[in-house]
Design a protein with these regions (language model features):
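Short, Lys/Arg-rich N-terminal segment immediately upstream of the first membrane anchor
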Residues: 1-6
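Hydrophobic membrane-insertion alpha-helices, especially the h-region
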Residues: 9-25
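Flexible coil segments in periplasmic/lumen-exposed cytochrome c-class electron-transfer proteins
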Residues: 28-40, 68-86, 118-198, 202-203, ...
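Short extracytoplasmic
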Residues: 43-75, 79
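The feature marks the first
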Residues: 61-64, 81-90, 94-133, 137, ...
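Short, cysteine/histidine-rich loop/knuckle motifs that typically chelate Zn2+
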Residues: 64, 209, 329
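Extended, polar beta-sheet/loop recognition surfaces of beta-rich domains
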Residues: 251, 258, 262, 346-395
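C-terminal structural cap/anchor segments
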Residues: 318-361, 377
Length: 431
């Protein structure tokens, strides 16, 4: 019997057309449905509500993404690098023309907790997948505070993505796959402190946005808080893993790090420094300790120490020579650094991570230390892109990752070359 290819093709196209119509109807319904919320607009928020809203804004780290370098606070334009292209953050001041001054609380809630803005679906670079867990009260207070911000007329062309990622309607399918708008619920088997930490980490703090690996579509993997790549950096493991996570840290260590940008074991860098300066340093001691309690209770990831690279290995020999000529003055001979200022290398989760991306950033382009209320003049790390070859950078990182009792995979010159090329293309370092 002859195969009727025309009939098969007609059937396939017909089914595809029906699926497209169903999807279009679903997207239209989703973008126009009403969400249930007890939050109500307040015509005249009092000082107490504005203070609560400011605190929620700190906990949600709103300023970090909605403030471009050197620009007015919350006026948008901050470039957010994603695997799919660049997105510019929106203006969330009360300007009615270019900001959200004409919005209602319901529209604000729809954007923050449901990922739907005035132009359709929001990209999940806006962490509505986490903010969905925020309470009605926190959203109401946050709205009161944001609505009180001085208007800044600053029009932002947010969409910078190439086709097909520029098609926002496709995010309806993404949400169907990866987004569950589930409000936070206390775990009755846990303490009040644990639940407060869980609310902050899973909700407003949106820690998983950086510290959980993403799949090829940008959805969260199942490896919750076990580390993830972020615009060329690596957000480390936050589980109780004693090797690459916070298992060797105390609750006080975690709270101190989030409050000041450093502790006895680490000094922040990159996007984490921004988060500390803009967000966590402003949280109460009780909330920081609650975060620590929650993180310490997370099941350890499976990452185990690697076999140490032998001291006689050629990379170790070269690395020791580079370390003694370039690094020893600050990090000292035994890798202990300077307390609360220069990172110690012994049992450092950042140093021992299987992914050396953060280390490569710091060595090649340098890094300013965190500047917080507790540490107003953070130390700086000079750049070495102009001074050290790919082989030398790889060797000194391999040496520090495998000295003083450390054990981590060797870093290759090829990995350094790739990181250098990326930083050059982004104009972070010269050719």
């Amino acid at each position: 019997m002859a195969i009727n290819f025309k009939r098969i093709a007609t059937t396939i196209f017909g089914l595809a057309g029906i699926a497209a119509v169903i999807y279009g109807v679903g997207v239209t319904w989703d973008l126009h449905r009403t969400y249930t919320s007890t939050a109500q607009d307040s015509d005249a928020p009092d000082d107490a509500q504005l203070a609560r809203g400011r605190y929620v804004a700190y906990s949600a780290d709103c300023a970090a993404c909605h403030t471009a370098p050197g620009a007015a606070p919350f006026a948008g334009g901050y470039p957010l690098a994603t695997p799919f292209g660049k997105i510019l953050s929106s203006n969330i001041t009360s300007d009615k023309d270019t900001g959200i001054g004409s919005w209602t609380l319901a529209q604000f809630d729809r954007a923050v907790r449901h990922g739907q803005g005035s132009h359709g679906y929001l990209y999940p670079a806006m962490p509505y997948t986490s903010y969905a867990r925020m309470t009605d009260a926190d959203v109401r207070d946050l709205w009161a505070y944001v609505h009180s911000l001085a208007p800044v007329n600053h029009r932002v062309v947010e969409d910078q993505l190439p086709f097909p990622y520029s098609q926002r309607w496709l995010l309806g399918g993404w949400n169907l796959l990866f987004f569950r708008a589930q409000p936070f619920r206390d775990d009755s088997t846990k303490s009040v402190e644990y639940n407060r930490g869980a609310y902050l980490v899973e909700g407003a703090g949106h820690c998983a946005a950086c510290h959980t690996a993403k799949n090829f579509l940008g959805g969260d993997s199942a490896a919750f808080l076990q580390g993830g790549s972020l615009a060329g950096w690596y957000a480390p493991d936050l589980t109780a893993n004693p090797h690459v996570g916070v298992g060797a840290w105390s609750v006080d260590d975690i709270a101190t790090y989030l409050a000041t940008g450093s502790n006895e074991k680490a000094v922040s860098s990159g996007p984490m420094t921004e988060a500390i300066e803009n967000s966590t340093q402003h949280l109460t001691s009780a909330d920081l300790h609650a975060i620590g309690v929650y993180l310490k209770a997370q099941r350890s990831s499976s990452d185990a120490p690697a076999q140490p690279v032998a001291a006689t290995d050629a990379a170790m020999v070269l690395g020791k020579r580079v370390y003694e000529s370039q690094c020893i003055a600050c990090h000292v001979s035994n890798g202990s650094g300077i307390r609360r200022m220069i990172p110690a290398f012994v049992n450092s989760p950042t140093l021992l991570s299987n992914n050396p991306a953060t280390l490569l950033h710091i060595v090649l382009m340098g890094e300013d230390g965190p500047q917080t209320h507790a540490n107003p003049t953070g130390a700086g790390m000079p750049r070495f892109d102009w001074k050290l070859s790919d082989d030398e950078v790889a060797a000194v990182l391999t040496y520090t990752r495998n000295s003083w009792g450390n054990a981590a995979p060797a870093v290759s010159a090829g990995t350094v070359a790739q990181a250098r090329k990326q930083l050059v293309s982004q104009n972070w370092i010269g050719h």
